[in-house]
Amino acid sequence: MPRVAVLLPARDAARTVRAAAASILRQTERDLALVCVDDGSTDGTSEILVRLAERDRRVTVIRGPGQGIARALALGLDRCDADVVARMDADDVSHPRRLALQLEALEAEPALAAVGARVRLFPRRHVRGGMVRYAAWLNGLTTPGDVERDLLVESPLVHPAAAIRRTALQAAGGWREGPFPEDYDLWLRLAERGGRLTNLPPLLLDWRDSPRRLTRTDPRYALERHVALKCAFLARGPLARRREVALWGAGRTGKAFADALLARGVSVGLFVDVDRRKIGRTLRGAPVVGPGEVGRARGLPLLVAVGAPGARRLIRAELSRAGFRELRDYRCVA
């Protein structure tokens, strides 16, 4: 049995899959299996993968039904005969020591369910502001505590940079198909079961950005789908016995959270916002107050739902001055 099985789904990736697979087969950790799922390609991807398998016995090729990444991953997982399952995408490039360092981290810390790594976006001509901010935020999450604090801000691990303990993956139910991002759904379920998540400080993946990225084109990655996932997590855990919360943020994101929480029987008793046009009014039946009155939120779980660049840092500082403690009194959810 290999030390790690790398699961690589591919669909119409003939231009990039050879380099992606080569970056795995050239890892300093040689004791690996590469499980490739050709998910209904029509551009020659399958032929490229078959030739790789003919040259390297560590490569297995499976034909998928072309029904999406979650099903392809579930199909491939059945062929991953290793204690650690690592992910790889067909258009990215892993750095040579990626798997060795991730295996070392998982062996050193049994509480870790999954470990990612810092990433570098490429090619530069396609990289846009939102992805730059996301990568900078994610690259700052290099301890389990960092990830726990920011778990509900965004997906805290890059899927193709992750290595997952197989026992934790199976206990969480593996990858699920649904109207949500399958990777973030998995991270939340791993955390819900007590698994710790982190990213290694070294840069270990070149992560391709392109106008066709699913996060830009697939409705499963829309704001409302992320909010629904987060609220489901909150309702099962931190808010399981609560029927009212306070929300910092009366904009689009705050409203989305208010609606998603109400659908789960949790109402908003107070909104906090810096916009003077909103202060003094009501929203979803709750008063909107300024930051100076955040003390009115005491006794209620406070969710910070402001995604504007730089806002989270300022709000954390304001709440610290007001005596609020993160994860005990409030959580950032955007």
Located regions from the model:
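Conserved donor nucleotide-binding strand/loop of the catalytic core
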Residues: 46-79, 109
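A conserved acidic beta->alpha catalytic loop
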Residues: 38-47, 89
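Short aromatic/hydrophobic "clamp" motif used to bind/position activated sugar donors
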Residues: 85
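N-proximal low-complexity "stem/linker" segments adjacent to membrane-targeting elements
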Residues: 1-23
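Acidic donor-binding loop at a coil-to-helix junction in glycosyltransferase catalytic cores
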Residues: 180-186
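Flexible acidic/His/Gly-enriched loops in nucleotide-sugar-dependent glycosyltransferase catalytic domains
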Residues: 69-77, 101-105, 109-168
